[in-house]
From Swiss-Prot:
Belongs to the methyltransferase superfamily. TrmY family. Disulfide bonds: none annotated. SUPFAM superfamilies: alpha/beta knot. It is found in: Cytoplasm. Gene3D superfamilies: 3.40.1280.10. This is tRNA (pseudouridine(54)-N(1))-methyltransferase. Its EC number is 2.1.1.257. The keyword Magnesium does not apply. GO terms for molecular function: S-adenosylmethionine-dependent methyltransferase activity; tRNA methyltransferase activity. It is an enzyme of class 2 (transferase). The keyword Methyltransferase applies. InterPro entries: Alpha/beta_knot_MTases, TrmY, tRNA_m1G_MTases_N. S-adenosyl-L-methionine binds at L114, G138. The gene is trmY.
Length: 192
């Protein structure tokens, strides 16, 4: 099982998301919705650290097993809004925010920070295809530097990996990473 993490400095934490025109008012949760829908691994989970207020940072946890009902950006927004408002949802929310993320990250290794200035992906193929990695990225903005440093100190660092010379959106990066990992899943499925 793998974990995909989006750190959103602007993601709204209270669930007050309009049904239409939600990109701006939601603090760009649409970026997280597209990242969720881009992940191809069936046993993965997406965790989004929302830091845009009005409540303190919160961790939205969205298992890919919900994809049967979450098939679009809009349906992601509906589920996220329900979870953030404490209503019944296939997503969950942890109000401990940063500490909840650190605790979740401790269960996965290696912890890979997907960064433009990271090492070449081809040099880290073994880590990328390990059985329980975490892939961490920013949303439409880079994660706050102080937060990354705090997490690195508490977790013993991150492996920084770049997927190439282009500046890509989070959903494109997650699509690429999960597509590269798919042959590994196909092989393990065939042997069972």
């Amino acid at each position: 099982m793998s974990l995909y993490v989006v750190i959103s400095p602007t993601g709204r934490t209270d669930g007050n998301i309009p049904a239409r025109g939600y990109a701006g008012p939601s603090g760009r949760l649409d970026v997280i919705a597209r990242a969720y829908n881009a992940i191809l691994e069936p046993n993965a989970t997406l965790a989004a650290l929302l830091m845009g207020g009005p409540l303190p940072p919160r961790l939205l946890i969205a298992p890919l097993s919900c994809k049967d009902i979450v098939r679009s950006e809009r349906s992601f927004m509906i589920e996220a809004s329900r979870a953030l408002r404490g209503r019944r949802s296939c997503f969950t929310v942890n109000d401990e925010g940063v500490e909840a993320l650190a605790s979740l990250l401790r269960r996965f290794k290696p912890r890979i920070l997907l960064a433009e200035k990271g090492g070449d992906i081809s040099s880290h193929w073994g880590e990328m295809c390990s059985s329980s990695p975490t892939f961490i990225a920013g949303s439409h903005l880079d994660p706050p530097h102080g937060l990354i440093k705090h997490l690195e100190r508490s977790l013993g660092g991150f492996l920084r990996v770049s997927v190439g010379p282009l500046s890509l959106h989070t959903d494109h990066v997650f699509l690429l990473v999960s597509a590269l990992r798919l042959p590994m899943h196909a092989t393990s499925i065939e042997h069972h």
